[in-house]
Amino acid sequence: MNLLNKSLEENGSFLTALYIIVGFLALYLLGRALQAFVQAADACCLFWYTWVVIPGAKGTAFVYKYTYGRKLNNPELEAVIVNEFPKNGWNNKNPANFQDAQRDKLYS
């Protein structure tokens, strides 16, 4: 209240009231500017998400499904992956066992 009393003594009640009103008006305008900025940022994010992120993800899924995904469903490739995978797990300290499906042999 010391600042208010000093302003009242030096400037009078009219100018002090005017300064207070101008201060509140400045705070109001600052709030409106921030609100407009947040609204613009929200619209920008929504635009990029709608027109870039979602179509990009769907396009990537589509390309994967009809290119690499189709190749991965090849039974010959699956047989190679399954049969050449070590039969004793990931972190086993024993030497890996590999199975040769074409010759029905087990290698270690």
UniProtKB/Swiss-Prot annotation:
GO terms for biological process: disruption of cellular anatomical structure in another organism; viral budding from Golgi membrane. It comes from the Viruses. InterPro entries: E_protein_CoV, IBV_3C. Residues 88-108 are annotated as: Disordered. Plays a central role in virus morphogenesis and assembly. Acts as a viroporin and self-assembles in host membranes forming pentameric protein-lipid pores that allow ion transport. Also plays a role in the induction of apoptosis. Homooligomer. Interacts with the M membrane protein in the budding compartment of the host cell, which is located between endoplasmic reticulum and the Golgi complex. The cytoplasmic tails of both proteins are important for this function. Interacts with Nucleoprotein. Belongs to the gammacoronaviruses E protein family. This is Envelope small membrane protein. It comes from Avian infectious bronchitis virus (strain Beaudette) (IBV).
